[in-house]
Amino acid sequence: MLRTVDLSGRSVAVKVPATSANLGPGFDTLGLALAQYDELRVSVRPEPGATVVVRGIGEGEVPTDETNLVVRAIAHTFESVGVELPGLSLVARNSIPHGRGMGSSGAAIVSGIMAAKGLLQGVADIDAQGLLALANDMEGHPDNVAPALFGGLTIAWVTPDGPRFKKLIVHRGVSPLVLVPERVMSTALARSLQPASVPHEDAVFNVSRSALLVAALIQSPELLHAATEDKLHQSYRASAMPETDRLITLLRTNGFAAVVSGAGPSILVLCSDPGQRLAAARLVATQGAAAWQPLMLAVDFKGATVPRIAEDAVSGEGDTTAV
């Protein structure tokens, strides 16, 4: 039985970063938060149901009723703490590309969960582990939502008691470049191309590279090229995104640590410094790859942010803190 709580007048603002999952060898384990953001404003309204206004990416395309992914994430969070969902008014300002492997679905889920956490402040407390569990309930893969929640580099794993994460601070020299194509890619299609099993030696190869990649990202960026080699998933998906595969091959041949971003088709290039990032962007430009939008992004270290006290957000005086 859900209890009714008076949340009249409450409003909350949320800001969630883009993410890149896998990072080459870290399939379903590693994720990186990137400084490109979706922003959300949620207010409680007297009327039941939800209204949604979407601005920016997804405007005119994503649902604007209770079936909206953000609304569903809010509802899931309220239900998890036994509180009835009030009427809601949502305004979303999106800049994370959809269907490009930059975590747009995960960002929507995290936006909703964090908005619910803000609205429920003083009513129900949800700790970091609880936030990850709620997000994983909806997304299904914690590596996709952990960096959006907590920022930085995250290692995610699943135990019998639920998903877990470890956040690490990335070396200040690491300079991500994301190359975004015009076409989209279905995550479900990308996963369907994965084999049921892989050779033992390929698994060993990826274990070594994943361990090396963590060290490269937090301590030794000069090892990024060697550390981003992969034999578990990218080659199996190449047939579904040949342009991505060709550009990654070109970049890696020229010494750049290029990998598929998430499920693709975007490419993440992990550069050891801003100069190398500029060189990678210039190489892509010389190939006539005009269809690829280069995004020179910083690593986001905060993750999702939300006002400290929900009521303060009404007057715009809320103190913004990370999870």
From Swiss-Prot:
What top-level class of enzyme does the UniProt entry assign? transferase
Example of a GO cellular component annotation carried by this entry: cytoplasm
List the Gene3D superfamilies hit by this protein, alphabetically: 3.30.230.10, GHMP kinase, C-terminal domain (3.30.70.890)
Q: In which pathway does it act?
A: Amino-acid biosynthesis; L-threonine biosynthesis; L-threonine from L-aspartate: step 4/5
Q: Which organism is it from?
A: Leifsonia xyli subsp. xyli (strain CTCB07)
Q: Which reaction does it catalyse?
A: L-homoserine + ATP = O-phospho-L-homoserine + ADP + H(+)
List of residues binding ATP:
P97, H98, G99, R100, G101, M102, G103, S104, S105, G106, A107
GO BP terms, alphabetized:
threonine biosynthetic process
User: Family, per the entry?
Assistant: Belongs to the GHMP kinase family. Homoserine kinase subfamily.
The terms under GO molecular function for this entry are: ATP binding; homoserine kinase activity
> Where, per UniProt, does this protein localize?
Cytoplasm
Gene name of the record: thrB
Starting at the broadest rank, the lineage of the source organism is: Bacteria, Bacillati, Actinomycetota, Actinomycetes, Micrococcales
Give the protein name, as stated in the record.
Answer: Homoserine kinase
